[in-house]
Regions:
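Extracytoplasmic
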Residues: 30-32, 83
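Ligand-binding "clamshell"
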Residues: 11-24
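Beta->alpha turn/N-cap motifs
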Residues: 3-10, 31, 38
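Conserved C-terminal helix/tail region of periplasmic/extracytoplasmic solute-binding proteins
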Residues: 118-173
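Surface-exposed charge patches
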Residues: 10-11, 122
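A bilobed periplasmic-binding-protein/Venus flytrap-type ligand-binding module shared by bacterial periplasmic
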Residues: 32-47
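Secondary-structure end/capping motifs
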Residues: 43-133
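Paired acidic/hydrophobic, glycine-rich loop segments that form the ligand-binding mouth/hinge
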Residues: 1-4, 20
Length: 173
């Protein structure tokens, strides 16, 4: 049994007599690509949040476009991740991507996000990923737009939709 992810997964799957037991499409929303910034750093430098979000969605727009520039971007990303354009595009086709800030903002505001992160915290606790002192899955707090789960005095992860909203509304260029 091998646990891996793309691009290596595609190579393993091409090996004779292999079969896939599980993939992340079976746990939608549980594996999320994030841009993470220290809370104090972001509070002290809100323009950093705007710049990072703007750059993120500029790249997402380019890489998702059916243009020579989009193909070039995907080709460079493919090479950087150890595969070719065809392999990289196959990975993208099998991955739920938030190509627009509007879609990401809607996900950040959804009821599914706190429910999913609660399941992730439970899994993490069960497998000892919250640290030796954790007495329950609620040992850490996770903050969302208008709600939180876990320990309010020990917030370790914040899903702040502020910059997604600005980008979705066209206020970040």
């Amino acid at each position: 049994t091998v646990v891996t992810w793309n691009p290596l997964l595609a190579e393993v799957a091409a090996t004779p007599k292999t079969s896939q037991l599980f993939n992340s499409s079976q746990i939608p929303g549980e594996i999320i690509d994030l841009m993470v910034v220290n809370t104090k750093t972001l509070a002290d430098n809100p323009n950093l949040g705007k710049a990072l979000t703007g750059a993120w969605y500029e790249v997402m727009g380019i890489m998702s476009s059916d243009t020579p520039q989009g193909k070039e971007a995907r080709s460079k990303m493919a090479a950087a991740s150890g595969t070719d354009l065809k392999g990289f595009e196959a990975q993208l086709a099998a991955t739920k991507m938030f190509y627009t800030a509007k879609d990401a903002h809607a996900f950040a505001l959804s009821k599914e996000l706190p429910a999913t992160m609660t399941k992730v915290a439970q899994f993490s606790f069960k497998h000892g990923l919250l640290g030796e002192g954790a007495k329950s899955a609620e040992a850490i707090g996770i903050q969302f737009a208008g709600s939180q789960t876990g320990n309010a005095k020990n917030i370790k992860l914040r899903f702040d939709p502020t910059y997604l909203k600005l980008a979705a509304d066209g206020q970040i260029k």
